[in-house]
């Protein structure tokens, strides 16, 4: 399917509000060199993510529903490892937080979607691999342990061609 946005879903043992708080503490799990600059936890906040001179993107927090949802709009991007360097500009990054089974206390599902990151674009392979690492390892560990234990600065390097 050429129009399918990249999605990753994880299940964590912490309650929805803890997951929400961890997602909004972006600099702790979306690592880079130098990483995240700016505020990330209030509606209207704008922040920049950088990884060396390979990736630059500016995000604006456009939706925050405590314990339920976080949405960022990518307002600017420069991906130096692909031909269309602005491929992310205008895309949206969404985290939907839910309790998939109300009988199981403290189980939370997080559905990550990068709206606009679809198989037909040049960045899809590298970017979906990087997002998979960030969501399945870095964010999951940060939610579970309060710190990022899996994804080092080198982790991105293997996902994005230099």
Question: Where on the chain are the PLM-derived regions?
Answer:
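Hydrophobic pocket/interface hotspot
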Residues: 19-23, 47, 61, 72, ...
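Hydrophobic/aromatic beta-strand elements that line small-molecule binding cavities or substrate pockets
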Residues: 8-10, 58-63, 91-101
